[in-house]
Amino acid sequence: GSQFPAFSTWTEVRLGELMSPTSKSSLAPGIKPRVHVRTVGCPKNVVDSELMMGAFGAKDYDVVGEADDADVLVVNTCGFIGMAREASVQAILELAKVKEEKENARLVVTGCLSQRFSDELATSLPEVDLFVGSGSATQIPEFVGELPEEPDPALREPVLRVGKAGTLYDPDTPRTSTGVGYSTYVKVAEGCSQKC
């Protein structure tokens, strides 16, 4: 058996207190935008989520543990294991409900599910603002910043930013660790063996 936990359902990452963000906000002056990241899948997705949070922190976002407190809602999905795909869709739908109750909130779907099925997801999940492939985790804050400020829900279509799958990151890339104590995951490969 593996020493890593089985990721059969999504795991919510709650790290708001760990961030010390540092760029400009599209909200009222003096108010930092807030991001909530929910991770579904394997330890590789955990690493990608940590890198996303580091990228958001570098763009002056606060990472928050509660979806209700966020302006940007991100689901980092799994697209390979059946149960994790179902959990990914469940997480997307849960955060879509949160988005409906908030003015100008954004919903972003990234990870393997988005990489593999972005066209189908964009058709079936119009409440999602942005689909990002698995190779662009650290660019998500930039992509969110390019979305229209106040989109007309009746006219907008989801934006797809899906390119080359998978990326191994430079060790100096900003990262917010979700590990407990002195442990963390190290991503040494890209892809999925579907063995979990």
Put a short name on every predicted segment:
Residues 4-195:
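Proteins enriched for Cys/Gly/acidic motifs involved in redox and nucleic-acid/cofactor modification
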